[in-house]
């Protein structure tokens, strides 16, 4: 089966990060490669999937690394209710400054400026993990949208790569709306294809050209 209404790029599980980036930019020149060559403002790339375990975080970090190595200013941000992405980085430690969480609980239009001092860099810049789930911290999922929009407005980055979880709700549709491109990651299994088709069938009113 094929995923409905999407341009499908086949990427094997053990494909290198460089090959993944070249595959995406090569087959979707008008989508990502064009964005790299002709940037007018900060571009938001959202990595999404219909189910877990498909390698979405690997793809998101791979794109972040590849763009950085191509001399682009990149911010990687994990937008999950419970974050576990840090296991793929050298520094696993979460944000511990209570002032940051206080500001995230009541984000203003310049929330990025309020928290950018905690941003770290390994291969690429990234927002460190929160010390607990959004629920435990009393944070609304919409805080991610606020950070993205504020960081975009700052002009500090060429690309903001957002790695989101599989939850589909109103807040997630708002993230999709903010994104310039949405990469839907799947794998060659019946369960993954079915989940992707269900996801796509529930996304209405969004231009197909936004999706990779």
What is the meaning of each model-derived region?
Residues 107-119, 126-165:
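Cytosolic-facing regulatory segments adjacent to core modules
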Residues 11, 45, 75-77, 125-127, ...:
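Hydrophobic/aromatic beta-strand patches that form the interior of the parallel beta-sheet core
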Residues 41-81:
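Walker A/P-loop phosphate-binding motif and the immediately C-terminal alpha-helix
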Residues 5-8, 71, 157, 179-180:
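Short, well-ordered alpha-helix to beta-strand connector turns
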Residues 154-155, 159, 164-212:
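Conserved catalytic-core segment of NTP-binding enzymes
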Residues 70-126:
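Phosphate-binding loop that captures ATP/GTP phosphates
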Residues 1-44, 93-95, 102-112, 194, ...:
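Acidic-aromatic/histidine active-site loop/patch
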């Amino acid at each position: 089966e094929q995923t409905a209404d999407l341009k499908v790029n086949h990427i094997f599980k053990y494909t290198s990060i460089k090959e993944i980036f070249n595959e995406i930019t090569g087959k979707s020149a008008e989508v990502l490669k064009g964005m790299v060559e002709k940037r007018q403002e900060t571009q938001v790339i959202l990595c999404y999937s219909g189910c877990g375990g498909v390698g979405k975080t690997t793809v998101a970090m791979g794109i972040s690394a590849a763009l950085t190595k191509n001399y682009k200013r990149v911010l990687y941000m994990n937008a999950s209710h419970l974050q576990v992405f840090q296991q793929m980085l050298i520094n696993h430690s979460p944000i511990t400054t209570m002032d940051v969480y206080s500001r995230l609980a009541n984000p203003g239009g310049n929330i990025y400026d309020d928290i950018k001092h905690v941003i770290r860099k390994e291969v690429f810049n990234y927002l460190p993990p929160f010390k607990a789930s959004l629920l435990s911290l009393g944070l609304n999922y919409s805080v991610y949208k606020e950070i993205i929009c504020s960081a975009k407005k700052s002009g500090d980055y060429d690309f903001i790569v957002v790695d989101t979880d599989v939850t589909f709700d109103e807040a997630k549709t708002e993230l999709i709306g903010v994104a310039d491109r949405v990469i839907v990651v799947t794998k060659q299994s019946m369960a993954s294809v079915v989940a992707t088709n269900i996801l796509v069938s529930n996304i209405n009113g969004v231009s197909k050209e936004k999706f990779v």
